[in-house]
Amino acid sequence: PLGIKVEDLPDDFDAADEGVVVTKVDNTSNSATKILEGDVITDIQSGFQRYSVKDSDSFNEIVSKFESGDKIAIFGLRGGSRFIVPITVD
């Protein structure tokens, strides 16, 4: 639904204790211009509900809750800086 593939953070990753690293972005998805390979996703928010992304399993479980057209916010790290991007689910 988001057009991205993720993996668990490497054990030696110091910038965040939990989250996932983006390994691939589908160029045709709504995420394509907002999420980059190498980004770390730590949280996803839908409405007033915020979900912590602990690993790739929790990421997939969270994403499965959304339907096409839902508006969400992705919280993460890029190059050591925090970011928040709004995305409409594909």
Segment roles from a protein language model:
Residues P1-D90:
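C-terminal recognition in membrane/secretory proteostasis and scaffolding
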